[in-house]
């Protein structure tokens, strides 16, 4: 009989919460959505999918410490963007999970991501050096990806050499697999599970979607 996979076979994960939240005006991890913080929602959704969770955070560690998460700050100073958080995730994984070939990243501002995210991304990988990236409705979501930790040195060099530091541009330099996730059907219409919350208005929109999501999510 084949049992459920062990958590030892799941990838480790790092929640990306190291940005400045300039459009929101306050840290996103502590924002309340449907009575629970965004960080709480992301952890609850992520924990069954992965071997362990850390958080990339460059500010007040209190929200993370309440959950017992290890805080992984950027290793490159100056808030240079999400690639610095991805690099920190790779370096952390090499130190803490030496047997892991990849690390999963998810941003803290997208709390409705699929419950099948890690499993489907992992299934798409055919080689140790391949990046697996989530898509929905034909749109790439580059922060939802499985990253080969062996790319850490290359990524660090890219961050220092490329002025724009675009995540998509870094992915384009490497072998990658794409995984298309369906929209969530609801009574109010289809919802993109990668709907991200950058502004107070988008937070209100996410609140409006919550009543329609019960038992509808992939």
Swiss-Prot record:
Gene3D superfamilies: Spore Coat Polysaccharide Biosynthesis Protein SpsA, Chain A (3.90.550.10). InterPro entries: MobA-like_NTP_Trfase, Molybde_CF_guanTrfase, Nucleotide-diphossugar_trans. Keywords: Cytoplasm, GTP-binding, Magnesium, Metal-binding, Molybdenum cofactor biosynthesis, Nucleotide-binding, Transferase. The keyword Endoplasmic reticulum does not apply. It is found in: Cytoplasm. GO terms for molecular function: GTP binding; metal ion binding; molybdenum cofactor guanylyltransferase activity. Coiled coil: none annotated. It catalyses: Mo-molybdopterin + GTP + H(+) = Mo-molybdopterin guanine dinucleotide + diphosphate. GO terms for cellular component: cytoplasm. Its EC number is 2.7.7.77. Its cofactor is Mg(2+). It holds the Pfam family NTP_transf_3. Mg(2+) binds at residue 109. The N-terminal domain determines nucleotide recognition and specific binding, while the C-terminal domain determines the specific binding to the target protein. Monomer. Belongs to the MobA family. This is Molybdenum cofactor guanylyltransferase.
């Amino acid at each position: 009989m084949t049992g459920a996979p062990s958590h030892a076979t799941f990838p480790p994960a790092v929640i990306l919460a190291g940005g400045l939240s300039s459009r929101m005006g306050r840290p996103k991890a502590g924002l309340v959505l449907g009575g629970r913080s965004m960080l709480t929602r992301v952890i609850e959704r992520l924990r069954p999918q992965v071997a362990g969770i850390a958080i990339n955070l460059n500010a007040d560690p209190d929200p993370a410490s309440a959950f017992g998460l290890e805080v992984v700050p950027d290793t490159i100073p100056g808030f240079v963007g999400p690639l610095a958080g991805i690099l920190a995730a790779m370096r952390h994984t090499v130190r803490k999970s030496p047997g892991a070939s990849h690390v999963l990243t998810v941003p803290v501002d997208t709390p409705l991501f699929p419950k099948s995210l890690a499993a489907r991304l992992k299934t798409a990988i055919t080689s140790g050096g391949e990046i697996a990236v989530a898509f929905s409705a034909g749109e790439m979501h580059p922060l939802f990806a499985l990253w080969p930790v062996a790319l850490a040195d290359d990524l660090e060099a890219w961050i220092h050499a490329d002025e724009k530091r675009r995540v998509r541009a870094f992915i384009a330099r490497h072998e990658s697999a794409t995984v298309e996730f369906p929209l969530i059907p609801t009574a109010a219409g289809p919802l993109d599970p990668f709907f991200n919350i950058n502004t107070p208005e988008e937070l209100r929109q996410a609140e409006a979607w919550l009543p329609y999501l019960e038992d509808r999510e992939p």
